[in-house]
């Protein structure tokens, strides 16, 4: 329920004109990132217009999971990975309307560095993150031995 109240407050605060502008910025930001990253990531739908998000594939020999974890290591929110399922090693970027050009350019630079590092030494990305409180999880063990709890505190 709380998220609905927050969304309504956001819409009321922006108004019709502000919502239109926010949508335009979200679309502009997604298309800007897609264009800037076309030489770094594989863009499967390169010649199609994207709305507020776009999908890319990790370059040959690199995994989307490793790229996402390396972004977390740099303090950058990772994109959605492995969705949609029809895109191999998928990374789905959804820059919001509030991201500045400087933030988008920093994101591009981080991805360029990560991909370059991965091309030089693919194994170097497989342990990321190493400097965060939570390191790489054993996802296979987590899927096989789930611990579900309602205890949130």
Descriptions of predicted regions:
Residues 1-8:
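PLP-dependent aminotransferase class I/II
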Residues 11-153:
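Non-catalytic terminal extensions of PLP-dependent enzymes
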């Amino acid at each position: 329920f709380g998220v609905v109240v927050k969304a309504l407050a956001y819409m009321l605060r922006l108004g019709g004109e502000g919502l239109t502008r926010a949508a335009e910025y979200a679309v502009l930001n997604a298309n800007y990132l897609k264009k800037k990253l076309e030489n770094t990531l594989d863009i499967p739908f390169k010649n199609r217009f994207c709305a507020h998000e776009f999908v890319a594939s990790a370059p040959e020999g690199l995994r989307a999971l490793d790229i996402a974890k390396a972004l977390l290591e740099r303090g950058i929110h990772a994109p959605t990975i492995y969705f949609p399922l029809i895109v191999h090693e998928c990374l789905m970027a959804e820059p919001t309307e509030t991201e500045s050009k400087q933030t988008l350019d920093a994101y591009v630079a981080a991805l360029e560095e990560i991909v370059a590092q991965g091309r030089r030494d693919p194994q170097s990305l497989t342990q990321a993150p190493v400097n965060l409180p939570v390191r790489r999880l054993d996802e296979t063990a987590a899927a096989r031995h789930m611990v579900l709890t309602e205890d949130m505190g």
